[in-house]
Amino acid sequence: MTHDNKLQVEAIKCGTVIDHIPAHVGFKLLTLFKLTETDRRVTIGLNLPSNAQGSKDLIKIEDVFLSEEQVNQLAIYAPRATVNCIENYSVVRKMVPSLPERIDSVLTCPNSNCISRSEPVCSSFSVRARAGEVLLKCKYCEKEFAHHAVMEQ
């Protein structure tokens, strides 16, 4: 009797694979970026073994391709992620997210007094990195937050 210890996640024929997501961040990305708002199959692997990270999350979305803007927005929470475009079971394009200047309509401002929480406006944050930390500044209340504070909303 053979015993195979390798984890196997089914390959997709066509679509997007987001790999090297920090462990415990995959579900948050699915929610924030509305990656489940499709009628296509979405596969998520949580706490998978990773030589580089110890453990990682992985998301596969069949027949859906992310825009460059969407890929770059992932950099706020998964800066070392790779986004692979798959066609006929082969990687045809590999993208690495880079920090965008702005992120709109995705996040919620943590400031409970911000008008973006009570008025029908789309959230909007400017993004910058300082000393290895990602900071987000709300367009409306002009308060600046560490990305963890915004992620918890």
UniProtKB/Swiss-Prot annotation:
User: Where does the record locate the signal sequence feature?
Assistant: none
User: Mind listing the GO biological process terms from this record?
Assistant: 'de novo' pyrimidine nucleobase biosynthetic process; pyrimidine nucleotide biosynthetic process
Keyword check for Transferase, yes or no. Answer: no
Entry's Pfam families?
PyrI, PyrI_C
Q: Which domain of life is it from?
A: Bacteria
Q: What are the required cofactors?
A: Zn(2+)
Q: For binding Zn(2+), which residues are annotated in this chain's numbering?
A: C109, C114, C138, C141
Alphabetized, the UniProt keywords read: Metal-binding, Pyrimidine biosynthesis, Zinc
Role of this protein: Involved in allosteric regulation of aspartate carbamoyltransferase.
Against PANTHER family, the record matches this protein to:
ASPARTATE CARBAMOYLTRANSFERASE REGULATORY CHAIN
What family is this protein classified in? Belongs to the PyrI family.
Q: What is this protein called?
A: Aspartate carbamoyltransferase regulatory chain
Source organism: Edwardsiella ictaluri (strain 93-146)
